[in-house]
């Protein structure tokens, strides 16, 4: 039914809804996989469930009339996709003016809206939203005012994080998306040349990202206050002020995301982007793209290949030669960060699995002669076997497998309650071992959601960034995804010289080194091929 609504239009009569449908279909056809399209239609096509997205606007007064006009059009497109928008303004002395500008612009585009200037009553924890009618066809424009009963006075919220935390906690509706739209875009990343982080797993990265931003703010503040820079302030002072504002607002945006997403379901998604990107009329519109696919515009686990020694640019995330990186903040790919509350991550770096550091299959394990580790530090081999078999749809011979990997385990990565796993071993010559991804599995119903695959590959690339190899069957449908994350790929049946050629059903993938120099070391290549090619699978023949 939803596809039928999107596709139905009169030939030769291009109404605004026709243009909206064409754009949405362009995004859906060019970016969404079959599974994503099915998931989207199943989710938002159900009339019994109403999904809402909160759009938090920062710096609305600074946006041009054209941008506000395009924003109203974008809200109409979001509603066409089956998600209901609620607009929240950030604290500012201009909120009343901003609210009126939005209301008038929405009205011009046939959108009904209602300004709400007392969304909460401080002390009673009751929201006016709870007492109001259901906003099925009306867009609330929520102003950040708090009514203090003791003072009998309405006041602008001083702490926007606390305001949003309380507002969202008592909203009587299902919030599926939380979008922050500002002037500068997503959370800046030094690894991306100060363009935005692609994806942030808050449960894993929030603390470190917040500390980095705080340190950058402190360092920049010292530079701005340093008397030695007085003579330079005339030339670069305004730029440093711009940097300072960007960093402080980015820190607040990160805190807002953490506070709000922690109150929502784990499947909920956050997104931070600039207003220019949010209203772009292309298939790379980050808001439409995320509603349709629930992921970022580019994958966060793609490797940073170096384009040239001067610009040090990465092929997948930086502009073409000659373009200025600073101007890319207006490009959705460079100015958008997608965030999830995320899942717990555990890393077990036991070289050998024993009865003391494992749960299950103790009859196959030896004892280390030490005290048993706490439950959270033990690898659950029963669950490990379960996810591998569920993912590969094959039976794993645990006796054969444990004999093969024990004593040379590099790391075991576990996501959540064994919803995603990676088992890495050290293979190769004793004096020159290399990290090998032996098993990689994600529960079938979670593939593509929560960005589990990207999280696992990012962890592996950070931990084994100099050298990592894995293999995959030639006909594996995931090989294109693997290829995008590798420096190179070889067929394991090729003639490597200095040894017999063997028929093989696998391809070898390699990641490592900023320039992939090891891949031109033919002696090392022979070692990769020889050792990886001859690894015996541990599948049961039953």
Curated annotation (Swiss-Prot):
The protein's UniProt keywords, in alphabetical order, are:
Acyltransferase, Amino-acid biosynthesis, Mitochondrion, Transferase, Transit peptide
| Domain N-acetyltransferase: start-end pairs | 368-534
Which pathway is this protein engaged in? Amino-acid biosynthesis; L-arginine biosynthesis; N(2)-acetyl-L-ornithine from L-glutamate: step 1/4
Checking PANTHER family in the record gives:
AMINO-ACID ACETYLTRANSFERASE, MITOCHONDRIAL, N-ACETYLGLUTAMATE SYNTHASE
Which EC class heads this enzyme's classification? transferase
Could you tell me where this protein is found in the cell? Mitochondrion
Q: What does this protein do?
A: N-acetylglutamate synthase involved in arginine biosynthesis.
**Similarity field:** Belongs to the acetyltransferase family.
Entry protein name: Amino-acid acetyltransferase, mitochondrial
Keyword Transferase annotated: yes
One GO cellular component assignment for this chain's record is: NAGS/NAGK complex
Q: Kindly report the protein's main subcellular placement as a broad class.
A: mitochondrion
One GO MF term on file is:
L-glutamate N-acetyltransferase activity
Q: Which reaction does it catalyse?
A: L-glutamate + acetyl-CoA = N-acetyl-L-glutamate + CoA + H(+)
Q: What is its EC number?
A: 2.3.1.1
- State the Gene Ontology BP annotations: L-arginine biosynthetic process; ornithine biosynthetic process
Start and end of the transit peptide? 1-14
InterPro entries linked to this entry: GlcNAc_Synth_fun, Vertebrate-like_GNAT_dom
């Amino acid at each position: 039914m939803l596809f039928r609504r999107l596709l139905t239009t009169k030939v030769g009569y291009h109404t605004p809804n026709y243009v909206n449908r064409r754009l949405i279909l362009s995004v859906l056809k060019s970016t969404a996989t079959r599974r994503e399209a099915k998931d989207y239609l199943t989710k938002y096509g159900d009339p019994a469930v109403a999904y809402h997205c909160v759009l938090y606007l920062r710096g609305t007064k600074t946006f041009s009339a054209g941008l506000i006009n395009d924003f109203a059009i974008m809200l109409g497109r979001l509603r066409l996709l089956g998600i209901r928008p609620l607009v929240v303004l950030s604290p500012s002395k201009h909120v009343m003016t901003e609210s009126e500008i939005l209301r008038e612009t929405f009205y011009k585009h046939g959108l009904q809206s209602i300004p709400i200037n007392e969304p909460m009553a401080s002390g009673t924890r009751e929201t006016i939203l709870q007492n109001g009618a259901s906003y099925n066809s009306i867009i609330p424009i929520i102003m950040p005012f708090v009514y203090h009963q003791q003072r009998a006075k309405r006041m602008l919220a001083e702490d926007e994080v606390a305001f949003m935390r309380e507002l969202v906690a008592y909203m009587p509706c299902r919030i599926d998306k939380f979008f922050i739209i500002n002037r500068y875009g997503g959370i800046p990343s030094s690894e991306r040349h100060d363009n935005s982080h692609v994806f942030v797993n808050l449960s894993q990265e929030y603390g470190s990202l917040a500390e980095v931003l705080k340190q950058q703010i402190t360092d920049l503040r010292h530079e701005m206050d340093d008397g030695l820079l007085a003579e330079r302030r005339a030339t670069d002072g305004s730029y440093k002020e711009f940097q300072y504002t960007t960093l402080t607002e980015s820190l607040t945006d990160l805190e807002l995301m953490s506070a709000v997403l922690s109150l929502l379901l784990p499947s909920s998604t956050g997104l931070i982007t600039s207003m220019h990107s949010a209203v772009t009329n292309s298939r790379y519109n980050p808001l439409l793209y995320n509603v349709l696919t629930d992921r970022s515009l580019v994958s966060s686990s793609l490797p940073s290949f170096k384009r040239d020694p001067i610009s040090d640019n990465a092929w997948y995330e930086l502009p073409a030669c000659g373009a200025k990186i600073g101007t890319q903040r207006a490009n959705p790919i460079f100015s958008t960060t997608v965030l999830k509350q995320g899942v717990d991550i555990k890393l077990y770096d036991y070289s050998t699995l024993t009865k003391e550091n494992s749960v299950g299959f103790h009859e196959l394990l030896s004892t280390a002669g030490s005290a048993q580790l706490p439950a959270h530090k033990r690898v659950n081999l029963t669950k490990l076997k379960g996810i591998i078999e569920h993912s590969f749809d094959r039976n794993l011979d645990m006796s054969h497998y444990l004999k093969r990997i024990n004593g040379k385990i590099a790391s075991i990565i576990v996501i959540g309650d064994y919803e995603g796993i990676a088992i890495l071993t050290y293979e190769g010559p004793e004096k020159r071992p290399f990290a090998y991804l032996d098993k990689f599995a994600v529960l079938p119903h979670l593939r593509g959601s929560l960005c589990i695959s990207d999280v696992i590959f990012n962890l592996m690339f950070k931990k084994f960034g100099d050298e990592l190899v894995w293999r995959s069957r030639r006909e594996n449908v995931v090989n294109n995804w693997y290829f995008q994350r590798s420096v190179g790929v070889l067929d394991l049946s090729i003639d490597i010289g200095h040894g017999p050629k063997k028929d093989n059903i696998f391809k070898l993938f390699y990641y490592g080194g900023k320039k992939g120099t090891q891949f031109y070391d033919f002696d090392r290549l022979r070692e990769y091929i020889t050792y990886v090619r001859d690894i015996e699978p541990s599948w049961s023949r039953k």
